[in-house]
Amino acid sequence: MPTQSLGRAGEEATAQYLIERGCFVVEKNYRPAGRHEELDLIACDGRYLLFVEVKTRKQGTASAFCAQLAVTPAKQKRILLGAQKFLLDHSNYTCYQPRFDVACVTMLDNRVVQLDYYPNAFEAMGME
């Protein structure tokens, strides 16, 4: 499976995971105008506005073990900037508490074999 297709499959699996837990998906692959950041998923659970970074890997690869480590401080800062831009452009969501989550999806033969979800994986404090 090509890397982009693998990533999209992981994002779809994560969106379904969130929907099954009562969230609704606000945006997929949100890219603020004039910015380089892309937010994989934005969802809402009624209390929090979830900005979800999805990392998808093939089972059996070295990178599958440490997918969550791929969300570096630099990547966290880009996610934060994208989230700020989203909230500026969508004031109807400012009543929700933002939360930054990470989903690690492992796939084998075009199917999800594991989905680990880390709510509040990092915080905005100290990154501004």
For the regions a protein language model found, what residue spans apply to each?
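Short acidic/glycine-enriched loop/turn segments that link adjacent beta-strands
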Residues: T3, G34-H36, R111
